[in-house]
């Protein structure tokens, strides 16, 4: 079981939580990005740099993620694809994407894209707060304990 991170848009504070968890639980964590990223020295943390381009990072994560892996992403289409492969998807706000509701989230995302494309301004998500960081850490810890129980 591994953790895959859609790292280009992942907040630094979430990456720091992941770094600590990777070392503490000795779980391979790979940050996939189209730019160079600083990471702490650890045999459990690595970066995978891919070419710049539309969905290149997403496609690489989909290709590499396996059933039971955890994917960290705020990208709903990416979450849908890894869920279909049997991986879990967690967004940086601590929401664990569910197979039962991912289609609804995709539809809402597409609708919001249509609104923005027609010139209607929509608000983005609020800043990442303490509550979201705690929920992310709680969900991550829950997954890590499940992995430890299987070892």
Curated annotation (Swiss-Prot):
Source domain of life: Bacteria
Regions crossing the membrane: none
Family matches, as InterPro entries: UPF0178
PANTHER family cross-referenced by the UniProt entry: UPF0178 PROTEIN YAII
HAMAP family, per database record: UPF0178
NCBIfam families in UniProt: PRK00124.1
Similarity-based family: Belongs to the UPF0178 family.
The protein, known as: UPF0178 protein SG1713
Upper classification of the organism: Bacteria, Pseudomonadati, Pseudomonadota, Gammaproteobacteria, Enterobacterales
């Amino acid at each position: 079981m591994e953790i895959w991170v859609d790292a280009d848009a992942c907040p630094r504070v979430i990456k720091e939580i992941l770094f600590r968890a990777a070392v503490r639980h000795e779980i391979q964590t790979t940050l996939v990005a189209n730019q160079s990223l600083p990471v702490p020295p650890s045999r459990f943390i690595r970066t995978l740099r891919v070419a710049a381009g539309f969905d290149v990072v997403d496609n690489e994560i989909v290709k590499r993620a396996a059933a039971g892996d955890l994917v960290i992403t705020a990208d709903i289409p990416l979450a849908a694809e890894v869920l279909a492969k049997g991986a879990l998807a967690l967004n940086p706000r601590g929401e664990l994407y569910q197979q039962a509701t991912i289609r609804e989230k995709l539809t809402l995302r597409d609708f919001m894209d249509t609104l923005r494309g027609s010139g209607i301004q929509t608000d983005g998500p609020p800043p990442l707060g303490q509550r979201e960081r705690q929920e992310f850490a709680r969900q991550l810890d829950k997954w890590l304990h499940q992995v430890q129980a299987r070892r």
